[in-house]
Amino acid sequence: YFTSTMSFARMMMSGAALPLVFGSFILTIVGIVMMSAAASKQSVGLSLVGYVIFASTFGLTASFGLANYDLPTINAAFIATAAITFVFGALGVTFPKFFQRVYGIGFGILLATILVEIVLMFMGVSQSITDLIVIVVFAGFIGYDTYVATTVPPTLPNAVLMASNLFVDIINVFLRILNILGRRD
């Protein structure tokens, strides 16, 4: 609700949003660290607190981007993301060894792509190709994380961590598809 109010829009226009975005990013990382620690200690309370911090701050950060698109574009991105999630989730369970082998390669490609995006951002160059690369990499991560979710002991802290890992993968695919579809309008 807060992100749809006029006072929020004025704050964004005034440039006061940078500390909010930076703080939200830091808290998102804190939530991820808490969930990881909770999974290793099997602490339900720490896991849930980490999840609340992660989900609320990540959602706040994502809402900044969603405000720039119309509903048909968001709907199309949602449908495409759901299809990718279904297909790569099924592939992750069907071909786990493949996803185990390519996980490290995908992570390396992701880091290289982030560095390239930073350079391209300062050069003012279109990043459509990097959007496609990130979609492919995170689709692979969806397969890998789906596979991993089937191998960990079925406890609440593990479930929260695995769901959060998949959420990050899915939201990254969604935001990149949204970015590509939004350029067509």
State the predicted function of each range.
Residues 1-185:
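A hydrophobic alpha-helical transmembrane-helix feature that marks the membrane cores
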